[in-house]
């Protein structure tokens, strides 16, 4: 058995309905689209959220909130990902070199997810309480 020889079991898939192919099919002539109107035409239909000219719900409701521009350049680094970094000192440049964070990241925060076995020194990164405890338990330290 090979991937290119796989096929569904006989009778498992029914043939698709072919519309507009005669009266006997039950979907001839108008092909299940009814008579006239925008939805019967080729390419006919309205965009999602359109309410026939009535002011749409999206616009009736007020705007709220914003996206912090700092969040665009901030990354969350899991404790387990610190193992990918070579060397004992882990800073933002070390994370970028190890491809843990992308080049446009300016701030990073280490969170407790996964484990770290070797002692490391975390420099210039924010660290959560749980991650701080785990790093110090492994014999590492955090430098602000």
UniProtKB/Swiss-Prot annotation:
Q: Which UniProt keywords apply?
A: Ribonucleoprotein, Ribosomal protein, RNA-binding, rRNA-binding
Q: Which GO terms describe its molecular function?
A: rRNA binding; structural constituent of ribosome
* Cited SUPFAM superfamilies: Ribosomal proteins L15p and L18e
Which superkingdom, per the lineage? Answer: Bacteria
* The UniProt record lists the keyword Cytoplasm: no
Q: Does the record carry Metal-binding as a key word?
A: no
Q: Give the function comment from the record.
A: Binds to the 23S rRNA.
Family according to the record: Belongs to the universal ribosomal protein uL15 family.
Q: How does it assemble?
A: Part of the 50S ribosomal subunit.
- What protein name applies here? Large ribosomal subunit protein uL15
Source organism (scientific name)? Shewanella amazonensis (strain ATCC BAA-1098 / SB2B)
Question: What lineage does UniProt assign to this protein's organism?
Answer: Bacteria, Pseudomonadati, Pseudomonadota, Gammaproteobacteria, Alteromonadales
